[in-house]
Every structure is written in C-alpha cells, then in structure tokens.
Amino acid sequence: MRAPSTSANLGSGFDVVAVAHDAYFAEAYIKLTSGCGVDIKFRGFNPGSDNTVKRAFQHLFERLGRCWGVEAEVVNNIPIARGLGSSGASAVAALAAFIREAGLRVEPAVVVEAAGLGEVAAAGSPHFDNVAAAALGGAVVIASVKPLELVKFMPKLIFVIGVPDVPPMPEKTKVMRSVLPREVSFRTYVAQLARVSALVAGFAKSDPRLVALGMSDEVVEPARAPYVPAYGRVKRYALEAGALAVSISGAGPSIIALVEEKNSDVVKAAVERAYIEEGLRAEVKVASITEGALAQNI
C-alpha cells in the first residue's frame, strides 16, 4: 500500500487545504500476528521509537476498541522535513495497508483522525491537512475539525515542485508557526476570505485560474518566506517562465508552482536555474494531482 506526497496550505488555505501529488510516495507492508501491539521497521530514514506510525496505530486501535498484532514495514521515499507530508504519508500508508489486510471497513475520517493525531510525534501537535490529502487524494478541504469534516475534489492540476537539499531546520514546525502574525487587519481578513474562496472554487471547477488566485497570500507566506531558501528567486523565475502561481509547500523548504501542461518543462528548467544561481542543490519535479491511499482499498 502506498500514500502520496502532499503539499498543504497552497497560499491562502493555511491549515485547511492540501493536495496529493505523484512527486513521491511512501509505502507500507503489513503482516497480522497474534497478540496485541505494533512492531514497525523503517527502511531508509528511521524516526525513532516514538513516531507518527506507532501513534497513529494507537489512536486507531483506541477508536476501534480493539488491539491487533501487527508487523509493519515502512519505506518512505518522500524527502523528510521538506514540507511534503512525509511523516503523515507513512502513517496513512501503514493504516491503509492494515485496514485492507484485516478486512475492516473504516470511515476515511477515522483514518485521517488517527493519522492526524499521530502527527504529534513529528510536529508536536495534531495536523489533519497533509494526512487528509494522503488518505483521500486529490485536493482536500478541512471543513471542520470538531467534528472532523473533509471535502475532497479531484481537479486536473499540474505542479512544479522544488525540493532543496538543505539541512533540516530544528523544530521547524514550531519555528515556522512562531513567526506568523497574531493579528491581521479587517481588510486583510476579507481579502484572505476571497482568496481561500477562489481556491476552493478552483478545486470544484478544476479551474487553474481560480486556484492561482487562491494561492496568493499576504498573511502566512510573507512571514515565512525569509526562512525558505531561494524563495524569492524561485518564485520570480517560475512566474517569468509562465507559472500561474507559486507558494511554499507546507512549512517549507519545498516550493510548489501551479503550471499549465504546455509550459511545465519550461517552468521546471527555470526553477532549477534559480536554485543553481542561489548555490543550492535541489530536485525539481513535475507532478500531478493523484489519488490517496484509501482509494486502493475500494
């Protein structure tokens, strides 16, 4: 079972919007055993004994009112600490694989809730945007947290994603939240409502122009931009090459550009050049909206 990489926020949709794309995938393999508890082996990056996958299973078992014996192997091919939802995708892939192996029928919101609560191990607090997209696929809007209400769209969108090879920022999520403004003006509030409305309407209509309007942001992105390597040059070069919009992927340092298929390669080359001129190594990919891990259980 596999779950895709994701990009949360997309500008104005801070903490309530994420998209699943086929840039990278996390994979999980499950074997049911006797007894109760989860034994997890990680191939590649090992997050340690207190990890998102383990916590996600604990929350799921608690919600289902039963414990299973599980051996899990997780292969996470999503770059770690890059704003691409790597920890959430690994948890979602493992839960989806378990549900299929155990022959269970579990509501998607229950899986998202368990994986989102499991994110405390990686981010220090629950996060549902990335895990919702990894589970459901497409573009997901969190309409409510309590109770958890998710709305999925499946727009045809293409992105160019730049993933810089830089050292992980210590306590990245905490730092990137600490720089956010505590108050905004009423004018900014109204403008931001208009943008997030355009973002959701763009998802619903599969309209890149509306999505691009929604990816503009004057609240979160300006505060975080100084902490994202090459942000200014990458954004400028991408827009000059024909990108429709550019924003930070999650809390960064990856950057995501909305593009048209006809000029995706041109934008990709422009983003690559921007990183080179900044003296940074980076992997740049063209990616499309994709389905999530739970779609494989249908």
Curated annotation (Swiss-Prot):
Source organism of this protein record: Pyrobaculum islandicum (strain DSM 4184 / JCM 9189 / GEO3)
Compartments reported by the entry: Cytoplasm
GO biological process, one term: threonine biosynthetic process
This protein's encoding gene: thrB
Record-given protein name: Homoserine kinase
Keyword ATP-binding among record annotations: yes
Keyword annotations: Amino-acid biosynthesis, ATP-binding, Cytoplasm, Kinase, Nucleotide-binding, Threonine biosynthesis, Transferase
Lineage: Archaea, Thermoproteota, Thermoprotei, Thermoproteales, Thermoproteaceae
Pathway the protein contributes to: Amino-acid biosynthesis; L-threonine biosynthesis; L-threonine from L-aspartate: step 4/5
Entry GO MF terms: ATP binding; homoserine kinase activity
Catalytic reactions of this protein: L-homoserine + ATP = O-phospho-L-homoserine + ADP + H(+)
Binding-site list for ATP: P79, I80, A81, R82, G83, L84, G85, S86, S87, G88, A89
A GO CC annotation given for this chain: cytoplasm
Classification via HAMAP family: Homoser_kinase (MF_00384)
InterPro entries on file: GHMP_kinase_C_dom, GHMP_kinase_C_sf, GHMP_kinase_N_dom, GHMP_knse_ATP-bd_CS, Homoserine_kinase, Ribosomal_Su5_D2-typ_SF, Ribsml_uS5_D2-typ_fold_subgr
A Pfam cross-reference name: GHMP_kinases_N
Family: Belongs to the GHMP kinase family. Homoserine kinase subfamily.
Entry EC number(s): 2.7.1.39
Known role: Catalyzes the ATP-dependent phosphorylation of L-homoserine to L-homoserine phosphate.
Record bears the keyword ATP-binding: yes
